[in-house]
Amino acid sequence: MASSPERNDARRGHKPRQQGHFSRRPEPVADDWLWGWHAVEAALANPRRGEPELILATPERIKQIQAKFGVLATVQQADNQQIAQRLPQGAVHQGVAMRGAVLEDADLGDFVGGPGAVILMLDQVTDPQNVGAILRSAAAFGATGVVLQDRHAPRFTGALAKAAAGALDKIAVARVVNLSRALDELTDAGWRAIGLTGDSEQVLGDVLDGRPTVLVLGSEGEGMRRLVAEHCDELAKIPLPGGFESLNVSAAAAVALYEASRPRN
């Protein structure tokens, strides 16, 4: 059931008013926009998001926003061309874009481990499309969260959010300074760390045992760094019977998450 406009306005601190119309004056493209219906819808529903500065939407999208979230004072009506002016060239915005809703990072302590729980840790995976796809898989398979390094990881831009198809706001993401120390903290809290590498003799399916698990994936070119691998409890590989040497990191994450989601005795 949709929330009433008045209740949503009270919750968000807005006074209901008529939707404004976006000015036709072009402004510089900014990199703090989210676009696409799934990304914007998930962001508006996420309590870890700050208040948006501006939402540009076509009349049809405004109706959808009002039906689900009530009347928001930050919404302005715009046509597709006006929305596209604010976004990177080629952005597929589907008639809606949102600016300025900052996403709060999760803390490692927020990740509660139970039987079968899985965290993904990404070691220097820098491509926004890959990270977005990994977040989407993590949300689809019910992962507890994702851990990134605060450097050598992409910012949460609109391109990443679009690739994640709303998953950026449906799964907790923690950014840490040092992955090795983060692994120590998680293992002290009862998590078991398994690093994925094609050099291992062990197969992932044989190493997983149903305990709370951190799956660590490295970049496609370099893989996991040595120090990160040394802080894992086990190293394992994804078997590739077709003879191909490796998978794209987002594909590897999806396969690993599927394997981890299978019931185990």
What spans do the regions from the language model cover?
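N-terminal positively charged helical leader segments and presequences
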Residues: 1-113
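Structured adenosyl-cofactor binding patch, chiefly the S-adenosyl-L-methionine
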Residues: 41, 46, 139-140, 162-167, ...
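Short, ordered loop/turn segments at secondary-structure junctions
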Residues: 59-60, 80-83, 151-153, 178, ...
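Short basic, glycine-rich beta-strand/loop surfaces that mediate nucleic-acid
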Residues: 90-101, 164-167, 210-218
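RNA substrate-binding interface of SAM-dependent RNA methyltransferases
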Residues: 113-202
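Short glycine/serine/threonine-rich phosphate/pyrophosphate-binding segments
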Residues: 129-133, 224, 249
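Active-site/ligand-binding-proximal alpha/beta "capping" segment
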Residues: 194-248
